[in-house]
Amino acid sequence: FASPILQRLSEARTPDHRLRALILTPTRELAIQIGESFEAYGKYLSLRHAVIFGGVGQNPQVEALNRGVDILVATPGRLMDLHDQGFVHLEQLEIFVLDEADRMLDMGFIHDVTRILDKIPSRENLGMFSATISREVMDIAWVYQRDAAEITVREDEQNKPDIKQFRMDVPHDGKADAIEKILNETGFDRCMAFCNTKGSTERITKFLQMRGIDAECIHGDIPQRKREQVMEKFRRGELRVFVSTDVAARGIDVDDVDIVFNCDVPDENQDYVHRIGRTGRARRQGVAVTFISDYPAKMRIDDIAQKTRNEIVPVKFDEDGRLTTA
């Protein structure tokens, strides 16, 4: 959406750089990524943009707003905070994009989202984008959008990601060991591991580091600056394993991830789709392995396989420690 927004705003520039386009996103990492896209695509335009999010001091963000911005990328909490302080003005907003709409609601931002929507004077250019659209998102669309058109992009077989999906029975305390064995056998260099809890990310990362594997993790309790440093190391290829929770990983855009490990089965089917979609990009073959540690996890992965229509092949380690079909 960045390119058409830049094109439209550049065709009718305003000298005072008033806020005309707002992009709302659930996480700091994704906000930064979107801001980088506007920076790259709008390099030779006279439009200004700013990125605001919580977890850091607001003074630099306020200074950018006071200088005037045409485009604002924001997370809900910091946006409402600065709006309530009088630093963000939505009266002349022309374009509003709600990115990762489903995740926004899952994270409990529904109240902030509706407050923002209520303050927008015109909803003729209101767009919602998400890899998966929940019923709650559609409810918002029907209430706030005028004569909305629903556009679904279908994957054709030629461009469908080639991701081999596997499932493996692994005890709770054996997940990091399983990752190490798979890495030793496959030689994969760039890997992502997803956990459902912050504690799990810490434990698995510590184990991998003890085994001499370059691994680091991010989650919601890690300071923003540290999270950005870890993500940049992964982008540069300096980490072999990047461990994260679902929310913290939003905004990571790396095309050559060899394998995705689901250390815990995600609670939502859409999270499974988001996770494995990190691999198999740019016409490369990807691999996703999900660890099953108890009966509820088995039931969840069975439901995911059925609902997403994916074949998830059972695998195990044989007596020699090699991977084989179960």
Outline where the language-model segments fall.
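Conserved helicase RecA-like core
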Residues: 1-326
